[in-house]
From Swiss-Prot:
<feature type="disulfide bond">
    <location>
        <begin position="53"/>
        <end position="99"/>
    </location>
</feature>
<dbReference type="InterPro" id="IPR050122">
    <property type="entry name" value="RTK"/>
</dbReference>
<keyword id="KW-0732">Signal</keyword>
<dbReference type="InterPro" id="IPR020635">
    <property type="entry name" value="Tyr_kinase_cat_dom"/>
</dbReference>
<feature type="binding site">
    <location>
        <position position="614"/>
    </location>
    <ligand>
        <name>ATP</name>
    </ligand>
</feature>
<feature type="binding site">
    <location>
        <begin position="471"/>
        <end position="477"/>
    </location>
    <ligand>
        <name>ATP</name>
    </ligand>
</feature>
<keyword id="KW-1015">Disulfide bond</keyword>
<dbReference type="GO" id="GO:0048916">
    <property type="term" value="P:posterior lateral line development"/>
</dbReference>
<feature type="glycosylation site" description="N-linked (GlcNAc...) asparagine">
    <location>
        <position position="107"/>
    </location>
</feature>
<dbReference type="InterPro" id="IPR017441">
    <property type="entry name" value="Protein_kinase_ATP_BS"/>
</dbReference>
<dbReference type="InterPro" id="IPR013098">
    <property type="entry name" value="Ig_I-set"/>
</dbReference>
<dbReference type="InterPro" id="IPR003598">
    <property type="entry name" value="Ig_sub2"/>
</dbReference>
<dbReference type="GO" id="GO:0005634">
    <property type="term" value="C:nucleus"/>
</dbReference>
<dbReference type="InterPro" id="IPR036179">
    <property type="entry name" value="Ig-like_dom_sf"/>
</dbReference>
<keyword id="KW-0539">Nucleus</keyword>
<keyword id="KW-0067">ATP-binding</keyword>
<dbReference type="GO" id="GO:0043589">
    <property type="term" value="P:skin morphogenesis"/>
</dbReference>
Length: 810
């Protein structure tokens, strides 16, 4: 409970708030230095505590506080200006200590987390042993003294916490205690910072735990009469390193009448415990801002020791008066940084009820509204009819099939490259009609059979195909592994492993149309080394089978994850051994191959719309192949594709114009490629870690971007940032990306394998960053803020010269 209280008060904004409290009300604060992370100390009862406040300049005054309460010099706590001493600490001395040093030009703040071990456990242990010695002196094998306190085996704690495991036991002679981690002896040099073992308390203590501390911890207790053991499982939850995120639109502007009640709400998302405060902007001598540009504010509501975050997220104003009108700010901060949103309260006097309009006016209004509604309904019906006709015409002109008299005619386009030799013939409707059974599917029960054309260039006899195990399910069908004979025309007896796409048992007519459409699209696109290629199809005398290349190593995301080096913070599995080492060259090669595949698809006028590591497959020879491109739409005659149906959207991979306007272009695919690059260099990490999807929209509009992965060079990160440019036309083309990655691949071809213990800047040439970042923030390590004067991503504020720097100068 003490640690929870300490984390709750570990905040960046305490210095600002206390400085304002110490000054006269309404006076703007001196600009503060950004405080560092709190320093943590753990002491035993009776030890001496000495803390020192080290300011960068001569200080005029130093103030010490404990849990936000000012300390005074006394017998127990001695204060010597910039030093604080407690000769013998007690458990009640645990808490968050802070020193505030006021200087001529700035204020300096330091925080200290102090934890004093309670001796109660030791007393309990001693009393148990004394009782045992009095009651029994006979030889006895070890037994647990307090088994009820050992029932909780799984302990999930946030990073930086202190963890204690206890295995108190009785026995005669007194048993010995040994600790194991993951079945092996646990030694102090195996952990950064070591650990403490208190034999008399049967306890192991690990301070400031990190993700690499995850695992199974076993206490082995034994004497010459026997042994017992108990295992605790520790899971360290990594914190999401970013400042608080406030929900967009909150608090909202309010309008109230004198005497009524008003509520402002502020929704805060933060992994480190946030500190929330409500402020009201005031005027001093007719001005709302001080000489340094900071606003005059008055604290209305501040978190106390027993105040919950939910209570702090709501500000209630009872019996509103005209003086309550003005600007209110929700200020939230943690150890990483701070955020704020403001709203206005407008107060009116009670308005007397207005006289009701006469009967004639009401009748005219009713007639006008009725006429308007009728016009709207007629217009809507006409537009819907026109849209339906246009959609039907477009559907007939596409590669997709449409049913007419129990036949599915296919119309092929001829504006394709010679690589797709099978599609060079101008489109007749049916080459050679043949019936395709629906297999009695319940969804296709109304249509017992379909007629599909036979394409001799791609047709594969069913007796040459042996289906194997399922590989997965797609949006309208399933994929099976299979062995096919005769795929290689030069070696007709050779057996090849393939993947077969087919419909599920509950498929609809549209599902069949989509599968055929994808097959025809793959025929037209042609073959390329870095895409999944069509090998053939079974369209006659049975269900439709679409035969494509088989990728033995699955998708790129899982391929990277199983090859993470031990100790990487994204994943921990003590029993997992990396399949093979990954080098910088390997990662760049993955990106280069995907870029080549996308360059080819772009040359064929195909937009992927769902480019991500999960949609890139890896062959046995580590060749990257882009999958599901057959679902893309042909855009020979238009420059963009606007999605008009609502479905599951991969929002964390989507460009802003696709998210907000549903416009898909090659440039939106480039944005997705930038996110895929981030996935590659985090070895399968999840984009925007710790950020709720509903907050992603606002953050992207404000120009936030993900930070550089630790295994990524500066040049490659600049490539990602180019892909994430707010203006689509300013993003690179896939042709340019292929050229840049080719150059990078040649420069990194002889580098060593990944070493996560050192910085990877050594792999990057001297690559100057010429990008301007007029509003970048170093306080947010999940995103970096990139916005320029010509980019439509600047935050929108009411016109005031000092808005946007309300609480801290940049």
């Amino acid at each position: 409970m003490k640690m929870m209280m300490i984390m709750k008060t570990t905040l960046l904004l305490i210095s600002v708030l206390l400085t304002q409290a110490l000054q006269s009300q309404g006076r703007p604060a001196i600009q503060d230095e950004a405080p560092a992370e709190p320093t943590s100390y753990t002491l035993d009862s009776g030890e001496k505590l000495e803390l020192s406040c080290k300011a960068k300049e001569d200080t005029q005054k130093v103030t010490w506080t404990k849990d936000l309460v000012p300390l005074v010099d006394g017998e127990h706590t001695r204060l010597r200006n910039d030093q604080m001493e407690i000769e013998k600490v007690e458990p009640t001395d645990s808490g968050l200590y802070a020193c505030f040093a006021q200087g001529l030009n700035s204020n300096h703040t330091e925080y200290f987390n102090i934890s004093v071990t309670d001796e109660e456990d030791e007393v309990d242990s001693s009393s148990e042993e004394a009782k045992l010695s009095n009651d029994q002196n006979l030889p006895m094998a070890p037994v647990w003294a307090q088994p009820d306190k050992m029932e909780k085996k799984l302990h999930a704690v946030p990073a930086s916490k202190t963890v204690k495991f206890r295995c108190q036991a009785n026995g005669n002679p007194t048993p010995t205690l040994k600790w194991l981690k993951n079945g092996k002896e646990f030694k102090r040099d195996q952990r950064i910072g070591g650990f403490k073992v208190r034999e008399h308390m049967w306890t192991i203590i690990m301070e400031s735990v990190v993700p690499s501390d995850r695992g199974n911890y076993t206490c082995l207790v034994e004497n010459r009469h026997g042994s017992i053991n108990h295992t605790y499982q520790l899971d360290v939850v990594e914190r999401s390193p970013h400042r608080p995120i406030l929900q967009a639109g909150l608090p909202a502007n309010r309008t109230a009448v004198v005497g009524s009640d008003v509520e402002f709400e502020c929704k805060v998302f933060s992994d480190p415990q946030p500190h929330i405060q409500w402020l009201k902007h005031i005027e001093v001598n007719g001005s709302r801002y001080g000489p340094d540009g900071l606003p005059y504010v008055r604290a209305l509501k501040t978190a106390g020791v027993n105040t919950t975050d939910k209570e702090m997220e709501v500000l209630q104003i009872r019996n509103v008066s005209l003086e309550d009108a003005g600007e209110y700010t929700c200020l939230a901060g943690n150890s990483i940084g701070h955020s704020h949103h403001s709203a206005w309260l407008t107060v009116y006097k009670a308005v007397p009820p207005t006289q009701l309009p006469n009967q004639t006016y009401l009748e005219v209004l009713i007639y006008c509204v009725g006429f308007f509604l009728i016009c709207v309904m007629v217009g809507t019906a006409v537009l819907a009819k026109m849209h339906s006709s246009a959609k039907k015409s477009d559907f007939n002109s596409q590669l997709a099939v449409h049913k007419l008299a129990k036949s599915i005619p296919l119309r092929r386009q001829v504006t394709v490259s010679v690589d797709s030799s099978s599609s060079m013939h101008s489109g007749g409707m049916l080459v050679r009609p043949s019936r395709l059974s629906s297999s009695g599917s319940p969804m296709l029960s109304g249509v017992s059979e379909y007629e599909l054309p036979q394409d001799p260039r791609w047709e594969v006899q069913r007796d040459r195909l042996v289906l194997g195990k399922p590989l997965g399910e797609g949006c309208f069908g399933q994929v099976m592994m299979a062995e096919a004979m005769g795929m290689d025309k030069e070696k007709p007896n050779r057996i090849t492993k393939v993947a077969v796409k087919m419909l599920k048992s509950d498929a609809t007519e549209k599902d069949l149309s989509d599968l055929i459409s994808e097959m025809e699209m793959m025929k037209i696109i042609g073959k390329h080394k870095n895409i999944i290629n069509l090998l053939g199809a079974c369209t006659q005398d049975g269900p439709l089978y679409v035969i494509v290349e088989f990728a033995a190593k699955g998708n790129l995301r899982e391929y990277l994850r199983v090859r993470r080096p031990p100790g990487m913070e994204y994943c921990y599995n003590p029993d997992q051994v990396p399949v093979e080492n990954m080098s910088i060259k390997d990662l760049v090669s993955c990106a280069y191959q995907v870029a080549r595949g996308m360059e080819y698809l772009a040359s064929k006028k195909c937009i992927h719309r769902d480019l991500a590591a999960r949609n890139v497959l890896v062959t046995e020879d580590n060749v990257m192949k882009i999958a599901d491109f057959g679902l893309a739409r042909d855009i020979h005659h238009i420059d963009y594709y606007k999605k008009t149906t609502n479905g599951r959207l991969p929002v964390k991979w989507m460009a802003p114009e696709a998210l907000f306007d549903r416009i898909y272009t090659h440039q939106s695919d480039v944005w997705s490629f930038g996110v895929l690059l981030w996935e590659i260099f985090t070895l399968g990490g999840s984009p925007y870690p710790g950020v709720p999807v509903e907050e992603l929209f606002k953050l992207l509009k404000e120009g936030h971007r993900m930070d550089r992965p630790s295994t990524c060079t500066h040049e490659l990160y600049m490539m990602m940032r180019d892909c994430w440019h707010a203006v689509p036309s300013q993003r690179p083309t896939f042709k340019q990306l292929v050229e840049d990655l080719d150059r990078t691949l040649s420069m990194t071809s002889n580098q060593e394998y990944l070493d996560l213990s050192v910085s990877l800047d050594q792999f990057s040439p001297n690559f100057p960053d010429t990008r301007s970042s007029t509003c970048s923030s170093g306080e947010d390590s999940v995103f970096s803020h990139d916005a320029g004067a010509d980019e439509p991503c600047l935050p929108k504020f009411p016109p005031h010269p000092n808005r946007g720097v309300a609480f801290k100068k940049r």
